[in-house]
């Protein structure tokens, strides 16, 4: 209907005006699919936030090959997994073997990583952070980085296909079954899905 298309057009225009950074997960995609998705959003910088920038099963996402591949398509590559990775070396960031995002968000190295993203965003660069999980609700991109960026006035927009995205609010809504970040107990307490130590 005309009215529906009009509302969608207004929403899209509004979304484009907000301060934002993109996120993407490589999952089991091939490298060309990832590049096409990045190109569909005019990404200029791909920031790898994987703590371990390699893949045992999808070797085309190992750091060296990934860097070479995206730069061949004029997308600059940078690594910040040491600052923003979901598996920090700092063992005090873990509770019962799981990464505790309430602890991690207060570490100096993590705050430094957020400041670097904020700086790139303030300069108008079209940045996308990359991690392994293709579904953003299974990754610290949404449960930690997106939440903290939102507090800084920056929306994380999750690329889920060519010209397809989900907002941070949509992902949190799905993640919390519609309860949002605030529950009757206060702010949602997210951790990693698995135990690592």
Locate each region found by the language model.
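Residues lining hydrophobic/aromatic ligand-binding pockets adjacent to catalytic sites
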Residues: 3-6, 10-197
């Amino acid at each position: 209907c005309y009215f529906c298309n009009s509302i969608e057009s207004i929403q899209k225009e509004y979304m484009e005006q907000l301060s934002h950074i993109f996120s993407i997960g490589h999952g089991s995609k091939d490298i060309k699919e990832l590049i096409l998705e990045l190109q569909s959003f005019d990404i200029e910088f791909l920031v790898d936030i994987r703590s371990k920038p390699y893949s045992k099963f999808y070797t085309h996402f190992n750091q060296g090959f990934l860097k070479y591949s995206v730069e061949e398509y004029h997308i600059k590559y940078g690594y910040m997994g040491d600052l923003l990775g979901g598996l920090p070396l700092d063992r005090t960031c873990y509770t019962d073997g799981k990464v505790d995002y309430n602890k991690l968000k207060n570490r100096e190295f993590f705050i430094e990583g957020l400041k670097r993203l904020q700086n790139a965003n303030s300069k108008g660069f079209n940045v996308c952070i990359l991690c392994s999980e293709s579904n953003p609700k299974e990754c610290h991109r949404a449960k930690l980085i997106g939440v903290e960026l939102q507090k800084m006035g920056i929306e994380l927009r999750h690329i889920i296909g060519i010209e397809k995205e989900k907002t941070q609010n949509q992902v949190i809504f799905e993640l919390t079954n519609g309860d949002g970040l605030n529950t009757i107990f206060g702010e949602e307490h997210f951790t990693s899905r698995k135990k690592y130590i």
